[in-house]
């Protein structure tokens, strides 16, 4: 979708724009694209799905709802975290972020013109609870959209800040706290 849109914009419409595509070297099944999400893919995010709470195996005081946002290969960890939260009796809205930069650009353009509500804000209005944004970039990348999160919502970012580490993907994701268990733990903490 993004490559097709970019090629049309550059070649057919002759716009002076720059596109880049980040490639990952991890093998994973690409999640199915929900219907009617083409605009969201191009504009930076779309609602991937929603999980309704199951009765938790162990009764807990914590229930409620959270919103998880994930990009790139970390989206698979976000989906696993959502399943863990669902098993704990928590409702989860899941958003796939295709471009933190595009979301930030849209928000900044809106700051300048003030003509409409930023796209990210619109998308998050129908979700619930604290928002956990996970990325395999440094936390500063998802932080670029903080200003466009609905005002009454807690927003926590998770990323891979640091350098010089070498290990397995699983170990590195656990170390940087962007694995499913860490994302679920961040959501539980945000619900306190």
Where in the sequence are the language-model features?
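Thiamine diphosphate
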Residues: 1-192
């Amino acid at each position: 979708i993004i490559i097709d849109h970019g090629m049309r914009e550059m070649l057919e419409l002759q716009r002076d724009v720059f596109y880049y595509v980040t490639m990952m070297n991890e093998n994973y099944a690409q999640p199915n694209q929900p219907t009617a999400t083409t605009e969201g893919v191009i504009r930076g995010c779309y609602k991937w799905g929603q999980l309704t709470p199951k009765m938790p195996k162990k009764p807990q005081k914590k229930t409620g709802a959270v919103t998880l946002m994930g990009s790139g290969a970390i989206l698979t960890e976000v989906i696993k975290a959502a399943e863990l939260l669902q098993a704990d009796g928590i409702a989860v809205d899941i958003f796939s972020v295709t471009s933190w930069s595009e979301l930030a650009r849209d928000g900044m353009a809106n700051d300048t013109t003030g003509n409409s509500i930023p796209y990210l804000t619109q998308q998050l209005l129908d979700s619930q609870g604290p928002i956990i944004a996970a990325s395999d970039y440094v936390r500063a990348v998802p932080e670029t959209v903080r200003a466009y999160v609905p005002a009454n919502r807690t927003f926590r970012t998770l990323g891979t800040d640091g350098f010089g580490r070498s290990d397995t993907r699983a170990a590195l994701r656990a170390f940087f706290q962007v694995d499913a268990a860490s994302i679920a733990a961040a959501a539980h903490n945000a619900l306190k």
